[in-house]
């Protein structure tokens, strides 16, 4: 595992332990069970495909470890509304604070402002975080195969499905893809950013896409900035994309989102 992921895992496990002390899982689970039902994340993506459109998972991200501050004028509800107006199918909201300046409060606020399903974008190491995600309204969670062993990934996926959520399985090489295909989720995200080096190349998606069964929903993640990038990934069968930084840097996010999708259609 990389130095970056090792550092992230260390602080995440400390965060989880502190959260468990502050709020036992039984109390949190009551909130999760009482929350309004999840909005179908995979269903929303497939509805776009059925209409002949690309499906965009639009990301709300204030900062990142590799780029620092991405957007100073950061208003999650307004950004969510801009993405919805621009034609996004779903939202992705960063909730990790140390590396991304994210927050569960941003997830709650963004989701409340729109009708789109929302992914809790975070480093998941414990089923407690899954319950926490649902209690805060998340419709989908992320499993990063590079961060977990098979048993951990299965436990987290099972917990999410038990709460009615969808799961995005993230891979960035053949070994991780083979492991992800043993899980139940139909949604496989190919991260073009190597989490061990933080280098980005669309060639990762081009290499892995042909190995993903046609009944799975492929998601291209990271390094997507232009309609040409979308078209390049579409040539290997991808029609769902997770885009954050390039849209977060735009003054008019709704117009930029619309332009990205329209010019690529």
Curated annotation (Swiss-Prot):
Gene3D superfamilies on file: Aldolase class I (3.20.20.70)
Domain of life, per lineage? Bacteria
The text of the family note is:
Belongs to the TrpC family.
From the UniProt record, which GO molecular function terms apply?
Answer: indole-3-glycerol-phosphate synthase activity; phosphoribosylanthranilate isomerase activity
* Gene (UniProt): trpC
PROSITE patterns per the UniProt record, alphabetical: IGPS (PS00614)
Q: In which pathway does it act?
A: Amino-acid biosynthesis; L-tryptophan biosynthesis; L-tryptophan from chorismate: step 4/5
Task: Name the source organism.
Answer: Rhodopseudomonas palustris (strain HaA2)
Q: Name one GO biological process term.
A: L-tryptophan biosynthetic process
What InterPro entries does the entry give? Aldolase_TIM, Indole-3-glycerol_P_synth, Indole-3-glycerol_P_synth_dom, Indole-3-GlycerolPSynthase_CS, RibuloseP-bd_barrel
NCBIfam families per the UniProt record, alphabetical: PRK00278.1-2, PRK00278.1-6, PRK00278.2-4
Keywords assigned by UniProt, alphabetized: Amino-acid biosynthesis, Aromatic amino acid biosynthesis, Decarboxylase, Lyase, Tryptophan biosynthesis
Recorded catalytic reaction(s): these are: 1-(2-carboxyphenylamino)-1-deoxy-D-ribulose 5-phosphate + H(+) = (1S,2R)-1-C-(indol-3-yl)glycerol 3-phosphate + CO2 + H2O
Q: Name one Pfam family in it.
A: IGPS
Q: What is its EC number?
A: 4.1.1.48
Q: What is this protein called?
A: Indole-3-glycerol phosphate synthase
């Amino acid at each position: 595992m990389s130095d970056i992921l090792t550092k992230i895992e260390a602080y995440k496990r400390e965060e989880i332990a502190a959260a468990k002390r502050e709020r036992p899982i039984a109390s949190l689970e009551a909130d999760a069970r009482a929350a309004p039902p999840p909005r179908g994340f995979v269903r929303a993506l497939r509805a776009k495909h059925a209409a002949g459109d690309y499906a965009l998972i639009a990301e709300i991200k204030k900062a990142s470890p590799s780029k620092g501050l991405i957007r100073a004028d950061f208003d999650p509800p307004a950004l969510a509304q801009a993405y919805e107006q621009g034609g996004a199918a779903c939202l992705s909201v960063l909730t990790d604070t140390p590396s991304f300046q994210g927050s569960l409060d941003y997830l709650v606020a963004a989701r409340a402002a729109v009708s789109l399903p929302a992914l809790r974008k975070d480093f998941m190491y414990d089923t407690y975080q899954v319950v926490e995600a649902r209690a805060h309204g998340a419709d989908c969670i992320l499993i990063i195969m590079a961060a977990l062993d098979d048993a951990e990934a299965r436990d987290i996926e099972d917990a999410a499905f038990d709460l009615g959520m969808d799961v995005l399985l993230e891979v960035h090489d053949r070994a991780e893809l083979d492991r992800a295909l043993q899980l139940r989720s139909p949604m496989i995200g190919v991260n073009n950013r190597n989490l061990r080096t933080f280098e980005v190349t669309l060639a990762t998606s081009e290499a892995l896409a042909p190995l993903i069964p046609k009944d799975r929903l492929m998601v291209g993640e990271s390094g997507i900035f232009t309609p040409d990038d979308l078209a390049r990934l579409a040539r290997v069968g991808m029609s769902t994309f997770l885009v954050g930084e390039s849209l977060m840097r735009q003054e008019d996010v709704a117009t930029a989102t619309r332009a990205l999708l329209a010019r690529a259609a």
